[in-house]
Amino acid sequence: MASLRSVLKSQSLRHTVRSYSSQTMPPASPFAPRHFLSIADLSPSEFATLVRNASSHKRAIKSGSMPQNLQGSLLGKTVAMIFSKRSTRTRVSTEGAVVQMGGHPMFLGKDDIQLGVNESLYDTSVVISSMVSCIVARVGKHAEVADLAKHSSVPVINALCDSFHPLQAVADFQTIYEAFTPKAHHLSSLGLEGLKIAWVGDANNVLFDMAIAATKMGVDIAVATPKGYEIPPHMLELIKSAGEGVSKPGKLLQTNIPEEAVKDADILVTDTWVSMGQEEEKAQRLKEFDGFQITAELAKRGGAKEGWKFMHCLPRHPEEVSDEVFYSNRSLVFPEAENRLWAAISALEGFVVNKGKIE
């Protein structure tokens, strides 16, 4: 089975940061807490548990009953939020989750801290982790969050990097779990087997973790991108490896024709065509993604299921999806956004409160 570390390392996703005074790389933290960098880090049962817990906590808290195991569970604990990229939903959901659990969120934006610029990632990780109970990092390169985790003495949770977005995947599958009646299932499943997701747009970090999760949960996913924007080979390897040990893993289809992806789909999904850092490519991308807008007409032409739903992690731009779909009763966009809060609570519970024991 290809590990997350081996797949990423083999594809040269590492990057250069400020050099160390010694030629020898400092050792990993001897305390070895468990980190959450991608859905690939989880077993199928652990992922399903995070999703179920998020949904359960949502029902309880919204009914006015804070689960006993969450009451004051982060009391006296500080969660450092290292955000080198701007954020709306991730920041609000993370800060809200920490506060609801009784902890203190400490926001460190790009004007407060620049990873690997004035201080090595090793020094930053060792120092900050000695003062807090968890690091939630929203960064550029995956290597940045991976290096933070390698040398941290506390759990590191990836709040987005260029390769993965695990908290979004938990929220997305919570949304699907709540919108579709689950079948009878074991603890390693969500009972969503047989569903099909159609992703139409850019193959990006949100898709990668969604596809890994879909494979683990027995949910098929069809991805339609323009030529040249397909899932890269190393990610295909990682997605495929996610199905090892799963009795009926979800199947992945890649195509350059949106209608092919949409056929028999239960959920249509898209995301921004121009991610942060790709602004100079905007004009070219808009030209090449022409024809990939999700519309009711596309769903009809492609033969989506009669009761199909729509999802988008936001922020949304009109070229990606029509207003008719985005604001329709098919849209799960706003419950999906709210579920970022419950996903954050579930992740903090699993990796900080329960020290990586997810049950």
UniProtKB/Swiss-Prot annotation:
Annotated keywords:
Amino-acid biosynthesis, Arginine biosynthesis, Mitochondrion, Transferase, Transit peptide
Tagged with keyword NAD: no
Xref: Pfam families: OTCace, OTCace_N
Q: Where is the transit peptide?
A: 1-24
InterPro entries referenced in this protein's UniProt entry, alphabetically: Asp/Orn_carbamoyltranf_P-bd (IPR006132), Asp/Orn_carbamoylTrfase (IPR006130), Asp/Orn_carbamoylTrfase_sf (IPR036901), Asp_carbamoyltransf_Asp/Orn-bd (IPR006131), Orn/put_carbamltrans (IPR002292)
Under PROSITE patterns, the record lists: CARBAMOYLTRANSFERASE
Q: EC number(s) in its UniProt entry?
A: 2.1.3.3
Tell me which residues bind carbamoyl phosphate: S87, T88, R89, T90, R138, H165, Q168, C313, L314, R340
What pathway does this protein act in? Amino-acid biosynthesis; L-arginine biosynthesis; L-arginine from L-ornithine and carbamoyl phosphate: step 1/3
| GO MF entry, a single one | ornithine carbamoyltransferase activity
Cystine pairs annotated here are none
Q: Which GO terms describe its cellular component?
A: mitochondrial matrix; mitochondrion
**Which Gene3D superfamilies does UniProt cross-reference here?**
Aspartate/ornithine carbamoyltransferase
The cellular location(s) given in this protein's UniProt record come to: Mitochondrion matrix
Q: Looking at the record's lineage, which domain of life comes first?
A: Eukaryota
Q: What class of enzyme is it?
A: transferase
Q: Which residues bind L-ornithine?
A: N205, D271, S275, M276
> Catalytic site residues?
C313 (proton acceptor)
Q: How does it assemble?
A: Homotrimer.
Family the UniProt entry places it in:
Belongs to the aspartate/ornithine carbamoyltransferase superfamily. OTCase family.
Q: What is this protein called?
A: Ornithine carbamoyltransferase, mitochondrial
Q: Which organism is it from?
A: Emericella nidulans (strain FGSC A4 / ATCC 38163 / CBS 112.46 / NRRL 194 / M139)
